[in-house]
Amino acid sequence: DERVEYKKLMKQFGNEGNTEKYEYFKKRQLVQKILLNSMYGVLGSPTFRFYDVDNAEATTLTGQMLIKYTQKTCNEYYNNELKDDSDHVIYTDTDSIFVSSVPIIKKRFPNANIEDDSFMTDKILIVAKEVQDHLNQKYNEFAKLYLNCDKHRFDIKQEVIAKSAFWVAKKRYGQWIINENGVTCD
C-alpha cells in the first residue's frame, strides 16, 4: 500500500527534522487518500464506466457502521476506565474519531500539570496506544459479527495531538496541533 509507505517516510523524515521531505511525503500520502476516496465515490456515479450502486452503497454503509462501532467501543473503553457513562468521543468524521485523553490522564495522575505539553504528549501517546490497540482488537469481532469475514483491513491509528480545538459545523473545525504522527509541531 503506497499510502502506508508514504506515511512511514513522512514520520521518519519528520523525526529526523527534514522538513522538506516530511512535507513532500505528507502531500504524497494525502494524494493517495484523495484518489482512493474518489474511487469509492465515483462507483456511485452512473456515468462512471465501472458504475456499481451496490458496491458504492456497501462501501458507504460499511464505513458508517464501522465509525459508529468505533465511537461506541471507544466510549465503552473510557466508561470502563473512568467508571462513568459519559460520551467521551467529541466528534466523528468519515474515517476518524476525536477524543480527549485528559479525563484518563487526570484520573491516573491527579496532581499532574495538564498545561505541561511535554508531559501531556507523553501520556496522551500512552493512552492513545492503549485505546488504539483495544479498538483494533475489537475490529476482529466487528468483522466476524457484522461482515461474516475473518480477514479485514480495518486499522485505526492515533494521528494528531491537539492542545485545543473548536468545531463550527460538520467537517469545519480547527485544531492547535502540537504533535502529528509522532512528530512535534510548532
Q: Residue ranges of each PLM-predicted region?
A:
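Conserved acidic
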Residues: 1-186
